[in-house]
Amino acid sequence: MASSINNSSQPTVPSISNNSHGDSFVNEGPPSNFKNNSLTSSTHSSTDHVNVLPISQDKEMDISSPVKKQKASYSNKSPNKAPIQKSRGSSLKSHLETESQQTPVKRRRRKATIRNVDYCSACGGRGLFICCEGCPCSFHLSCLEPPLTPENIPEGSWFCVTCSIKSHHPPKHPLSIWSQLYDWIDSQNPSQYRLPDDLVHYFHGISRGDTGAYKETEGEMDTDEFSALPTGSSITNLAYCGYCSKPSMGACWVYGCQLCDTFYHKNCKEHAKKCSHDSIGKKGMRVPKNAVVIRTPLVLDTTSNTLNPKVMISGWQFLMGEFPSDELLYFPRLPVSCLYKVSEDGLIKDFLYAIGIEAKKFNNERKKRELEVIPPDVKSALLPARTHPNLPIALRTLFNKART
């Protein structure tokens, strides 16, 4: 019995034949979508067109499985569609597009307009200013170094000393101990002398405004919160009497001992012997230690009617002028246990006095050094003239020392 395909009216189906080695192979027929094929087993007749399909006995054909097709013919894929391969350029482009979507675009911002202050950055006053183009500073023409006049104002943009140093970088001073200090001084704008902030804000009742001017801050203090009390000011540094343990009350002031940290009221001064200092009666009392005292040079007490008119008093006491002269020597009068104000005249005189002392010391040392480098023959010629009336006293003294 042989297997046959009855397909008289339809095209032939693929036939399976064996080669010389006994392997079967497929002869492709019509397309795979061809329908109405019947596969039967019957005795062949001479009238039908029969294609005999010899099947190897050792290899049976699985009729239920579909016929395998070659890869090169009748592919299910469209022949016009080739596999898409991404080039390197396209992958790089897609990568850049993805990265640009994740990273925000940086836009160039316009430079903000600088708004200069409406007061002089050197003295804090008002008036006609010249404004810096690189910072908010403004200056009076007379406050600059060197000063300017309305006739020689530079044309175009003007920059202060600090901005000019940052942009131009001038040569620095030779390396020395003070070179960094000199460089810092050269890079600073001119500024008026101001008291340190610790000293300005220490005294209760006064402060300094934005322009540098002093202002009074008197008013009722809110004591509901502990933070309302200024811990670093003079109002919390009270001096208490060593006898009655009370601070200054009205006209009863507190004074401190010069040899220890004990304080007494004026009415309790007879109890000052508790300090056990023998010289307490001679040196009197002093200002409380907790109060800040500006030390100025001692001057003669010309206003005192005491037997010893050459008693030296402090310049701070001398400048307090509002108190009677009999209390200047022993009991400098204070409204409370702390100082509220610092005399401006006392600061100026103290500063000038310190400069004068340093200048005298410097001049004496300079003259002494100049005398030391004089050759011996020249010095011997100058020595006979040491008693000349026009020769300064300092040089006369130096000549005497050199002679000896």
Swiss-Prot record:
Pfam families, per database record: PHD (PF00628)
Biased composition (Polar residues): 1-22, 87-104
Keyword Transmembrane in record: no
Region named Disordered: 1-110
A GO MF term: zinc ion binding
Domain of life: Eukaryota
UniProt-recorded name of the protein: Uncharacterized protein C16C9.05
